[in-house]
Amino acid sequence: MAPKAEKKPAEKKPAEEKAGEKAPAAGKKPKAEKRLPASKGEKGGEGKKERGRKKAKKSVETYKIYIFKVLKQVHPDIGISSKAMSIMNSFINDIFEKLAGEAAKLARYNKKPTITSREIQTSVRLVLPGELAKHAVSEGTKAVTKFTSS
């Protein structure tokens, strides 16, 4: 029972302090701003605006499902942590941005308005080092021929 008795006066003291500070707080804007979001009237007003139209979810595009599919093709018995998946997703986004930027530069240099598979292939050769570029080009060519044949 003693802890409850101690808690009640502690709860009343901030209320008394708020009541004591109420008169000077009228001139202070930060105190008034802190109290405004706490009121239910304003939250209800915002809710009325959202009732007519629901807030659309922002779609976040990731490569997570594709990374997982490739992992299962290569190592069917191995899993991947969410942190490792996030790192892989960031890695793919980074490589994509580098390749797209390089392809855009190549198109600009050649005064062409379109990025074709040729610009992508050249950008892969420029961005990726040595043997990795050769493998990437061969896999990319294979994927493009498979896509065009179907």
From Swiss-Prot:
Keywords: Acetylation, Chromosome, DNA-binding, Isopeptide bond, Nucleosome core, Nucleus, Ubl conjugation. SMART domains: H2B. The keyword Aminoacyl-tRNA synthetase does not apply. The nucleosome is a histone octamer containing two molecules each of H2A, H2B, H3 and H4 assembled in one H3-H4 heterotetramer and two H2A-H2B heterodimers. The octamer wraps approximately 147 bp of DNA. The keyword ATP-binding does not apply. Its main location: nucleus. CDD domains: HFD_H2B. It comes from Oryza sativa subsp. indica. Pfam families: Histone. There is a cross-link at K146 (Glycyl lysine isopeptide (Lys-Gly) (interchain with G-Cter in ubiquitin)). Residues 1-58 are annotated as: Disordered. This is Histone H2B.2. Belongs to the histone H2B family. Can be acetylated to form H2BK6ac and H2BK33ac. Monoubiquitinated by BRE1 to form H2BK143ub1 and deubiquitinated by UBP26. Required for heterochromatic histone H3 di- and trimethylation at H3K4me. May give a specific tag for epigenetic transcriptional activation. One of its GO terms (cellular component) is nucleosome. GO terms for molecular function: DNA binding; protein heterodimerization activity; structural constituent of chromatin. Residues 1-21, 33-49 have a biased composition (Basic and acidic residues). SUPFAM superfamilies: Histone-fold.
